[in-house]
Amino acid sequence: GAGKQYFSIWKRKTEKPISLSLPHVASRAGEVVEILKEFPELEDPKTGRSLMERTIIICNTSSMPVAAREASCYTAVTLAEYYRQMGLNVLLLADSTSRWAQAMREMSGRLEEIPGEEAFPAYLESTIASFYERAGKVRLKNGKIASVTIGGTVSPAGGNFEEPVTQATLKVVGAFHGLSRERSDARKYPAIHPMDSWSKYDGVVDMTRVEEARSILHRGNEINQMMKVVGEEGTSAEDYIIYQKGELLDSVYLQQNSFDPIDAACSPDRQREEFGILYDALMASYDLDDKNEIRGFFNQLRREFLDWHGTEFESPEFYAQEKKISEFYKSKAVE
């Protein structure tokens, strides 16, 4: 209930690969009908044409035979590899690998194999690893680089990240987006929890600065937990400013409006530009003592950033809003 499916659809619309391969394993029949109706109507923001022109959907509902459900992911990744050999960049989104693992469990049970943890087959980890390891870049004979990127959704029962499928997946993947029901209920979209999520890949912005910003986010979260016990009155102005900085980073950089054509997807150049201004605002020291004044200042700064997100990159409005933000936070900053 944290928005896995909508997040997947949003990724499909905003990513740049030439071909999309989408296995739906043991999805509810109504869910599949909805996808087949909606997808032809989705517009590719890059070309303005139907997104279905570069999409392959492989559906097996939960009522279909277990062998068909188990084969979904293999069929999809084989098609993805075919298009990779043609020199294309392919994105494969598997929804959901948990149901694929459940199909393997059913098949293993019928074959009377020795069960592993929670009755999943003993070879679950190696099977999941061999699936994800089929992703990657290749250099073709003509010198061109092509790739397959695999993104799998995992649906742990009761949100238990210790169950076998989740643990086997976390051991092999290079990045993890942990969706949070708490953030979804708070209307913070996409509902990716910044504390639970991680990546082994370098981002498009300077990683040293990213780590410094992340430390502010962690410290702000600690202060927030403390404030739930002692209240705002028991918090110093210095700690309250750090808490507000963490909230600012969360609301203006870690959240996006997928219904806004500009904010839904952001180019690397724009990301670097916006993070540079935000980083300077986070690292600045502020001459503020009253908590109402601190709250008002950061709320206004947050609104200015959100207005900035709605402007076209490198337009006069973009640079005017950037200047306005810089002047606003510097008016309260101390050297």
Model-derived features: where do they sit?
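P-loop NTPase catalytic core
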Residues: 1-304, 314-318
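C-terminal non-catalytic accessory extensions
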Residues: 313-335
